[in-house]
Swiss-Prot record:
Official protein name in the record: Inner membrane assembly complex subunit 17
Membrane disposition: Single-pass membrane protein
GO cellular component, one term: mitochondrial inner membrane assembly complex
Transit peptide extent on chain: 1-36
This protein's record includes keyword Lipid metabolism: no
Organism: Vanderwaltozyma polyspora (strain ATCC 22028 / DSM 70294 / BCRC 21397 / CBS 2163 / NBRC 10782 / NRRL Y-8283 / UCD 57-17) (Kluyveromyces polysporus)
Subcellular localization, as worded in the UniProt entry: Mitochondrion inner membrane
Topology Mitochondrial intermembrane: residue spans: 129-180
Family under the similarity heading: Belongs to the INA17 family.
Keywords recorded for this protein, A-Z: Chaperone, Coiled coil, Membrane, Mitochondrion, Mitochondrion inner membrane, Transit peptide, Transmembrane, Transmembrane helix
Function: Component of the INA complex (INAC) that promotes the biogenesis of mitochondrial F(1)F(0)-ATP synthase. INAC facilitates the assembly of the peripheral stalk and promotes the assembly of the catalytic F(1)-domain with the membrane-embedded F(0)-domain.
Topological domain ranges for the Mitochondrial matrix compartment: 37-105
Transmembrane segments: 106-128
Length: 180
């Protein structure tokens, strides 16, 4: 009796099924209609568990709208969860990519740094060697000039000393030894 009243209310309010449109007589639903509804709707609602089962039906008129809404909401929530999982995976992959910096990005700058630092080192080493060479050359030049002065002094001394001896020897030399 309760099912009859619910079906009657749905038909009167407009939320009923098209199957009942011709079966409501004086506010009651005949037993034949109830049997049909029970056999069709109840068994179909038991058979319909996914949207795929719903898509296999030829007509959606005899399917409870609450069941359709429930199936759509379930499928929507499943798809939302899948999308969120894919988005999380995508975000994690992007984080890994940003954290795992490839070595290829650093190869060229590393070579440039090595070449520039080697060039600066060689230039600095050359300048240092050149300054050291100039310093040693100046020191050796000073030694050469000191030795040259000493040599000139010795030569001068020897010449003066040699002239004195020659003068001494001339004085002691006899006049006749000139021709001999």
């Amino acid at each position: 009796m309760m099912i009859r009243n619910q079906l009657y209310r749905k038909c009167i309010i407009g939320g009923g099924r098209s199957i009942l449109n011709g079966w409501v007589i004086n506010g009651t639903v005949p037993n034949i209609g109830l049997r049909y509804l029970r056999s069709g709707i109840v068994t179909r609602s038991n058979e319909i568990k996914t949207l795929e089962d719903l898509s296999k039906l030829k007509n959606l008129d005899d399917v409870d709208p609450e069941l359709i809404r429930k199936l759509i909401n379930e499928r929507t929530s499943e798809l939302n969860i899948q999308n969120e999982m894919e988005m999380l995976k995508h975000i994690q992959n992007e984080e890994r990519k940003t954290q795992d910096i490839p070595i290829k990005r650093f190869i060229r700058p590393t070579w440039m740094f090595l070449l520039m630092s080697s060039t600066f080192y060689l230039l600095g080493h050359y300048i240092w060697w050149k300054l050291e060479y100039d310093e040693v050359e100046k020191e050796l030049d000073r030694q050469v000039t000191a030795l040259e002065e000493e040599l000139h002094n010795l030569i001068e001394e020897h010449r003066v000393h040699g002239e004195n001896e020659a003068i001494k020897n001339k004085k002691h030399k006899h006049w006749y030894k000139f021709w001999s």
